[in-house]
Amino acid sequence: MAQRAQRSLEAAKKAVPEGTFAVGIGLAVTGITTYAFFVACARGLSEKDYAAVIGGLWPLVFVVAPGCFLPLEQEIGRALAHRRSQNIGGGPVVRRAAIAALWGTGGLLLLTAIFSGVLRENLFKGVGGLVICFAIALLTYAAQHLPRGPLSGNGRFGPYGVILGAEGCIRLLPAAILWFAGVTDPVAYGLCLAIPPVLASLLSLRGQHGLVEPGPQSPWSELSTNLGYLLSGSVLAQGLSYAPILIATVLATSTQHAEVAAFVSGFFLARVPIILFQAVQAALLPKLARLAGAGEHEDFRNGLRKLVLIVIGVGVIGVVGALVLGPWAVQLFFDKAISGGELAMLAAGSGAFILALTLAQALIALMGHAKATVSWAIGIAVGAIALVALSAADVELFLRVELAFLLACLGCAAVMAVLLVRQMRAGVPAQSVERLLAGIEHEPLEI
């Protein structure tokens, strides 16, 4: 009996991927500090400026920056991990990635300059300084995602977790000071968002050596495996996740600043299940990896079904919680008023998005990159059609945004489910699950 218990304990330890706890702590810290940052902005800014910073700048940054740079980070980590397994230095890979990041950032900055007027008037409520904040954020997030790849690829998940947690803390501290000091300039709060990524990176890289070792020359193909599909899918997924507040901010009239501010606060409150979702993944996915690695494919399929059921359960809890406690929480923390029905709709959309994200990551793990990207595109098309139809029917702005978001996420999930079932019939190789773990455990969804 004692030997059996010892074997079970050793198996449990092996089942937990290296760095899970470090990254988990970083995620927890950044989650808490992010919501505290939202509270500071809600309390310190006018409703118009709050809508501009949190309803305009924040989602735009987190659609474009992670959408464009996270796939590059993932490919760096994958390539370096492969080289490390063969005792080959990855310096040339990182240099290739730096060149790609430089060109990509330059292109994004050029587009920002071209469309600066559109951004200022439609998303930033006439605050031109927020365009500068957005440009700074592109630079700092490019500078952050570039070292995150070598940290992940070299198994340095402690410093990786430090980046996640430190960014949230560095962002919150000056914002809290601005709030308590009575500063109401939205650009000041925008800089609190734009600058911290590079500071967090510098902090995490202190004392790190051997991240970029010399090695054989790296062809572009070593870095660009499925990069196009990863990039497209990442941008589409991040864009869909923030679509409700981006659309509401753009379509709202000048007399709806208070409603937009309340909607933005409710939207982020409804995203709390995403944090619970990541905790569930951290607990269950290692077990799935062990089952697949042992060739127990039927057990793997059963485990994946359980994961989907748990995701649905988390979504249901989120909807009920939003309906019952949501209005009270929004009033308490953000000093905004929003109905439980609206919050429940937003929570339902977030739950459907989580389900779609889970299925997308499983598809990618089974080398279904193109299928995942196409699924995101189809779902977004469904949402766009729904939004146009609801607008033609003169449905109230926020309700049509909520319904379109929900339908888009459900559309993505439905298409992915069909494609995933077909993909799994061909078998579940163990290396696919390793890719799934790498994609979820160490490449978290950007809040």
Where are these regions (language model features)?
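Transmembrane helical elements of multi-pass membrane transporters/channels
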Residues: 18-38, 166-167, 171, 189-204, ...
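Hydrophobic alpha-helical transmembrane segments
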Residues: 128-133, 161-210, 378-382, 396-423
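Membrane-water interface segments that mark the loop-to-transmembrane alpha-helix transition
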Residues: 14-30, 34, 56-57, 69-117, ...
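Helix-loop junctions and terminal segments of transmembrane helices
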Residues: 69-85, 266, 270, 274-295, ...
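Small-residue hotspots at the loop-to-helix junctions and early N-terminal turns
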Residues: 48-55, 59, 131, 257-272, ...
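Membrane-interface junctions at transmembrane-helix termini in multi-pass inner-membrane proteins
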Residues: 139-162, 342-375
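Interfacial segments at transmembrane-helix termini and the short loops linking adjacent helices
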Residues: 47-48, 116-133, 257, 323-351
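Interhelical loop/hinge segments that connect adjacent transmembrane helices in multipass membrane
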Residues: 2-14, 158-162, 182, 186-192, ...
